[in-house]
Amino acid sequence: MEFQLNLSDIPFNLENSLECGQVFRWKRENSWWVAVIDDRVVKLKQEDNLLNVISSSDSTNEEFIRKYLRINDPLPDILTSINRDHVMATAIHKLIGLRLIKQSPWECLASFICATYKNIIGIKNMISNICFRLGQRIEFEGIIYYTFPEAEIIASADRHTLEDCGLGYRAKFLLETANRIASREVILENLESAKYENVREILLENTDKGKILPGVGPKVADCVMLFSLEKLDAFPIDVWIRRTIQKYYPFLFDNDSNH
């Protein structure tokens, strides 16, 4: 499948959107960005107001790409609503066209469990290793790609296999969470229609056996809600976001470092 999207009058920057740390499987190959989305290879190239799309699947149509890249979000209205001082104005100008990516809930959850206390290069390497060891093989244009493994596949994997992928202590968390998702103790697909507060409570629930989703704290939960479950009121705060807010908006924090 090959087609173009006309993005005239639509603020969009492909590189800003794919390289900001919200998604980890995209790689630049010459002038194209390439990744596996769900069960298909997708190649994207932006040329001014045109977005070129090549995919291994005939079901990769304009609707699929628009949904994944959230092209239909009213970005100008959103930016106007937050452009209230010079700090935000500078950020908006520097990252013009950056959009959220609508990811698969399971892949998003697993990816951000891997992302804890790791830089982006390390996260990408871990996820690439997991896909190579456990994902389904796809051949496209003479190149081999791998899907992100379903929760059931990771749940049946040996812990040492995940450790060998570079996960370290995260292997235990990912394995246990994959088991909970595979056994349907938490059904991620059902959370998209629920309210933010309810979803957050579910993702962070503690049971008599410990956390229902090991490895999921407030930041991971907010990432999953924002990037895959349509919770646009979620606001993930990692150490870098916290430092930035404390620098420019210190009045938003009290003396409790957990807020």
Q: Can you say where each PLM-predicted feature lies in the sequence?
A:
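HhH-family (HhH-GPD) DNA N-glycosylase catalytic core used in base-excision repair
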Residues: M1-H259
